[in-house]
């Protein structure tokens, strides 16, 4: 009975999402799709590709299932899954190539644009302070990765820097909490720069992935960066 209810809920949410896509098409509103990819998808690249193509979804990003928050593990962990993901992306690329590239995959597009422009990244908005500002419903705010807003940890306490009602953004940069987060974030990015040949294509990774996988911002390679940057680059 519980499984039946879950299936009904999934079918309903899918139906609503497809109606939304139809409305966007009717009104010529451009959009992109972010798809969470799990182990179940690895055997179905053609099915996924045709879904996007046949529904006119031309800009797609793959978010590989991550170890994050209450998700203490991922179905995509391990070298065997990394190889399956390579095969999955190769198949997706071939299918799109055969049709004249009607579906643009974010992971490929990011790498291609950097290579074509002979450009490389030195950091990114998820490890650069206040490129992103996240505020919760009570006014508590944080920077760097939005996934860290209001998260509590043994190492850092709360990732929040203060409350927007009584602390300015400038004032928050003088707090011990900000200095500690900034020091560890900088250390992690520098380690990536020194040790990883893919650094110029990602700019030092994401703090939330480093924290959830290694317990500290002062770390480097993650499962997330292998799937998000390294493997797509290898496939190209």
Predicted regions and their residues:
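Long, K/E/R/D-enriched contiguous segments that form extended
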Residues: 47-51, 55-121
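C-terminal accessory region of radical SAM enzymes
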Residues: 83-115, 147-194
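Radical SAM/AdoMet-radical enzyme domain recognition
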Residues: 1-67, 74, 78
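Radical SAM enzyme core and accessory elements
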Residues: 149-152, 159-164, 186-236
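Short, small/polar residue-rich loop motifs at catalytic or cofactor-binding pockets
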Residues: 126-129
């Amino acid at each position: 009975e519980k499984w039946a209810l879950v299936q009904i809920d999934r079918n309903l949410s899918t139906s609503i999402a497809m109606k939304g896509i139809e409305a966007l098409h009717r009104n010529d509103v451009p959009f992109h799709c972010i798809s969470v990819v799990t182990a179940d998808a690895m055997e179905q690249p053609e099915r996924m590709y045709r879904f996007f193509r046949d529904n006119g979804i031309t800009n797609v990003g793959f978010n590989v299932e991550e170890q994050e928050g209450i998700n203490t593990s991922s179905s995509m962990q391990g070298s065997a899954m990394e190889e399956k993901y390579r095969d999955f992306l190769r198949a997706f690329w071939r299918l799109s190539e055969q049709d004249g590239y009607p579906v643009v995959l974010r992971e490929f597009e990011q790498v291609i644009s950097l290579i074509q422009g002979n450009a490389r990244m030195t950091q990114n908005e998820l490890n650069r302070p206040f490129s992103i500002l996240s505020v919760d419903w009570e006014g508590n705010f944080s920077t760097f990765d939005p996934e860290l807003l209001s998260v509590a940890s043994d190492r850092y306490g709360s990732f929040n820097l203060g409350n927007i009602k009584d602390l300015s953004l400038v004032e928050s940069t003088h707090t011990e909490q900000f200095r500690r987060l900034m020091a560890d974030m900088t250390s992690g990015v520098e380690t990536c720069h020194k040790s990883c040949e893919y650094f110029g294509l990602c700019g030092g990774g994401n703090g939330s992935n480093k924290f959830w996988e290694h317990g500290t911002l002062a770390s480097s390679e993650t499962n997330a960066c292998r799937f998000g940057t390294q493997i797509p680059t290898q496939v190209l």
